[in-house]
């Protein structure tokens, strides 16, 4: 497989440069997942949305895509949990290039149940997270891009930049909610 199957992608906002990192397959798990045996250093979690390509995307296709065209290439979505991890002593304060070398501070990815993709009003979507006995957190409409699909054109250009086609079934998790 020339193009890795699982990716993370995102940016701080719509005007920021999007960053992308392939994810090691051994650290991508279906929900429910037990992460106790996985080696973490500074573990945290982020609630995210993952999108799955429903068809192959060639480099020529990716080169000209806009967001609406890219949306039509997605067949499914799911809630995902990225286990964020830092292998640098500075953790989240590490320089950007260090974070990029660290798979953008990635530890593992848990994928929920896939459902057919449909555009939603992301400004109204709730994310409620409870971990053990910690206080529950709730976020509404807080995705930094406003719509997780916004990153699709940049991500697809990135993953096809070496001339390889992104196969159907390729997955991207789209940044914290």
Label each region the model flagged.
Residues 159-163, 167:
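Extended mid-to-C-terminal alpha-helical interaction segments
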Residues 150:
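Glycine-rich, small/acidic residue-mixed loop/short-helix segments
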Residues 166-177:
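Conserved metal-binding segment of the jelly-roll/cupin
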Residues 1-147, 161:
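Catalytic-core "active-site belt" of small-molecule-metabolizing enzymes
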Residues 157-159, 176-177:
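Short alpha-helix capping/helix-loop boundary micro-motifs
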């Amino acid at each position: 497989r020339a193009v890795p199957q699982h990716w993370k992608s995102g940016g701080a906002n719509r005007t920021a440069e999007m960053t992308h990192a392939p994810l090691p397959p051994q650290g991508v798990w279906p929900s429910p997942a037990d992460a106790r045996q996985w080696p973490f250093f500074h573990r945290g979690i982020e609630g995210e949305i993952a999108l799955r390509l429903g068809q192959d995307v060639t480099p020529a296709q990716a080169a000209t895509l806009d967001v609406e065209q890219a949306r039509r290439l997605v067949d499914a979505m799911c809630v995902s949990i990225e286990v964020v991890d830092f292998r640098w002593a500075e953790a989240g304060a590490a320089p950007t290039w260090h974070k990029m070398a660290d798979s953008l501070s990635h530890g593992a990815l848990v994928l929920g149940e896939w459902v057919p993709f449909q555009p939603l009003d992301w400004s109204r979507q709730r994310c409620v997270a409870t971990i053990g006995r910690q206080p529950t957190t709730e976020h509404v409409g807080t995705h930094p891009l406003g719509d997780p699909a916004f990153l699709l054109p940049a991500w697809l250009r990135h993953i096809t930049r070496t001339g390889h086609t992104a196969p159907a079934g390729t997955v991207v998790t789209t940044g914290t909610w």
